[in-house]
Design a protein with these regions (language model features):
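Helical "substrate-binding/catalytic lid" subdomain
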Residues: 167-293
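NAD(P)+-binding Rossmann beta1-loop-alpha1 motif at the extreme N-terminus of oxidoreductases
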Residues: 1-64, 90, 96, 161
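Rossmann-fold NAD(P) dinucleotide-binding segment
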Residues: 52-64, 68-117
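Hydrophobic beta-strand scaffold residues
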Residues: 28, 48, 117-118, 159, ...
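Rossmann-fold dinucleotide-binding core
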Residues: 5, 10, 97-177
């Protein structure tokens, strides 16, 4: 049985997720600090709310899509936040790529008020959000995850319950560590290919029929890098990828797990973010490596 649902955070990936929830259930209360985003969604049939407190009073399930755990804490526990107005039993579904320890602390503070919480990191970018095919990694109790499932099924395709609160966000950070590492090494390999006089699109095609293939070579390079498309549709901002990789590296350090490659990738991402700007989409890793190598990784058809 579904209940009145709210959505906070209507950014690049939040808005298409909110649209799909609205399509599935026919009702949605929305809030964003950018009121223009709320108005746009209201034109599609959502109920615009003027404050977090108003949204909390209208709903019993609240989905959050925010940049970091810091924003989640402010939205939930700050002045005028959700926790001050939400009824006991309200379920918060945190779609943010958050810090596992902070997610656990957030959950505990909400539980003290009788409010339920699950962390549900999402992967698949804007395209996956629009198509409702996101991968979703969940942390929370069995009962809370079961109650959240109808809403998660409205936005995602591959939905995996990883364990207790924090497990979803931990898994998301590991996913993005692998994403970043693949982006770095694939960009280096393709830059070398271009420098050696090989046609990048042919190298990508060969790799995608061989053991070196990955999501990066199968999707990001053909659809974005080879076309010279470094728009935000290609992936999250560099600042967010840096944050997620830092979560994995920090957790490895505190757990006594050696992570040579992960730490090197993190250092490279920070350098690239400094060079190209923190808001640059993460396929800009390839653009930075192109610059260092003095080549362009482009399809001959798009050159």
């Amino acid at each position: 049985m579904t209940q009145d649902v709210g959505f906070v955070g209507l950014g690049n990936i939040g808005r298409p997720m909110a649209v799909n929830v609205l399509k599935r259930f026919g009702r949605l209360a929305a809030f964003d600090i950018d009121t223009a985003r709320v108005r746009t969604l209201a034109e599609a049939g959502a109920v615009a709310t003027g404050s977090l407190a108003e949204l909390a009073l209208k709903t019993r399930v609240i989905l959050l899509s925010l940049p970091t755990s810091a924003e989640v804490e402010r939205v939930l526990h700050g002045d005028g936040g959700v926790a001050g107005s939400a009824a006991p039993g309200t379920l918060v579904i945190d779609l943010t790529s958050g810090s596992p320890p902070r997610s656990q602390d957030i959950a505990k503070r909400l539980a003290d008020r009788g409010i339920r919480y699950i962390d549900a990191g999402v992967s698949g970018g804007v395209a996956g959000a629009e198509a409702a095919t996101l991968g979703i990694m969940i942390g929370g109790s069995n009962a809370d995850v079961a109650d959240a499932m109808p809403y998660l099924q409205a936005i995602g395709k591959t939905i995996v319950h990883m364990g207790p609160v924090g497990a979803g966000h931990m898994t998301k950070s590991l996913n993005n560590l692998l994403l970043a590492a693949n982006m770095v090494v694939a960009s280096e390999a393709l830059a070398l290919a271009a420098k050696a006089g090989l046609a990048p699109e042919k190298v990508v095609a060969a790799i995608n029929g061989s053991s070196g293939r990955s999501y990066i070579t199968e999707y990001r390079f053909p659809n974005f890098v080879l076309k010279g498309d470094f728009s935000s549709r290609g992936g999250m901002a560099m600042s967010l990828l840096v944050k997620d990789v830092a979560i994995a590296c920090d957790t490895a350090k505190s757990s006594g797990v050696t992570m040579f490659v992960g730490n090197l990738v993190h250092q490279m991402l920070m350098r690239i973010s400094d060079e190209l700007g923190s808001t640059a989409p993460n396929q800009s890793v390839a653009r930075a490596i192109e610059g260092w190598a003095g080549v362009q990784i482009r399809s001959s058809k798009d050159a």
